[in-house]
């Protein structure tokens, strides 16, 4: 459920990067548009939105208190490992073919927000994001990169799951509740 993150790989310009533009949208307005696209993609994005809304304050606080490259990505990767270990579940990634099979559904949804996005550009983003994710999960034996206590962030993660359930219900009912989609 990567939502707009795959579009960080769309476009060369930092200022006009599709991923950045999508993340700057007001959540309620964004989901009002997305709900008219592919329901599964929109629901997945709703879970991503919910988790980001609840967890990002911890990620940003860590970034603000520490120096280093890619702290945001490292923190989120470590949190994913922490959650998977707490749940006793191995992290997995969909096969490449299944990811790429979503190209047109994803593109059709994003065009509701950014009309200039093309199917070819979407496919390119999905390929790059898939490769990035594979690199992140490249080894079976995964270790934490940061020396951090994720227990408080885990509580925020649990709140994000609860919010995610509500957000998905809103999306599937095509009723974008202002209370749910005002956390961004």
Question: What are these model-predicted stretches?
Answer:
Residues 1-184:
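N-terminal leader/auxiliary helical segments
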